[in-house]
Amino acid sequence: MTLESTQDPRLASPDAGVRRIAILDIADAEDDDDLPTLVGALRDDTAVEVRAEAARVLGGWGHPAAVDALANALLDADPGVRANAATALGQLKDAGAGTRLLPWASHAEPSVRAAALRGLKELRIAAAAVPARTSLTHDDAAVRREAVGVLGWLKSTEALPAIARLATTDVDAEVRRTATGALGLSSEEGHATVLPALLAALRDASWPVREEAATTLAKLVPHAALQALLAAMQDDAWQVRLRAARALGRLRDATALPALIAALAHPMGNLRKEAALALGEIGAVDAVPALEVAAADPDPEVRKTARLALSRLAQGGAA
């Protein structure tokens, strides 16, 4: 594709609003020949609203010129333009754009680096693992968080020890939460590396981290986590209890029956539903009386789930 621009006369208007509408119309036409016009508006227009609009619409192009323009816009003087450029980079779908974006993942400016890593995560190119691993120890929390995201999406098992350390020791709760979720890429052979970190995360001071730990344990279903998950059924945050109930259902260990039956009386309907579902998965007849009570729950979703669990039990156990 050549980069010969077709110029809309409205772009010469002294009215920034007119120029912005022109940018929208040009983008809606989806004509590759108009790409230079959008790139030029992002680079050169004096009005913030025009540059911001150009950054927003350029996310639909994977051409190297668009990637370069968006990456450069991460250094724009206006925070709105920078934010739109970062969002647009995260919408890139063409893996070929990754080669243009890779150098920006090592940029000295943390916000630029984080945005580049976010874009690379969506593209899932193997070469992104190198700057991502380097960024795991960056001073900026947003950079560390995006680096974990890249490695998680790439399923980089080599990075699991470093990610496990972040899950338990990072000073930023959102980094710990993201790292805890990324530990779910572990294979059964890698459980020895990640299980201690997940059990520690299940006791984190931040409830979203604890919730993420229970969610990840539900994916990995290691039986060694049984006691920790039972303890999590007493967590102050119902969201953590819900994820723990899901994990216990997947473990299918009758030891969890008392905790799950107790959860059927929780005031939060979503938790009651998850407890009923878990009891059905475990398939123990001792849960029948509690499930029969839950089958008359005021919440229709709880009733439906409890009746399904009873049906499974009547057929001889979990599905």
Describe the predicted segments one by one:
Residues 25, 57, 88-91, 119-122, ...:
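Core register positions within helices of long alpha-helical scaffolds
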Residues 235-308:
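Ankyrin-repeat and related helical/solenoid repeat scaffolds used for protein-protein interactions
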Residues 9-31, 60:
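Alpha-helical segment of the N-proximal tetratricopeptide repeat
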Residues 20-24, 50-60, 84-87:
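Non-membrane alpha-helical segments in proteins
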Residues 1-10, 31-44, 63-75, 94-106, ...:
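Amphipathic alpha-helical scaffolding segments comprising HEAT/armadillo-like alpha-solenoid repeats
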Residues 14-15, 46-47, 77-78, 108-109, ...:
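Short inter-helical turns and helix N-cap capping residues of alpha-solenoid HEAT/ARM repeat scaffolds
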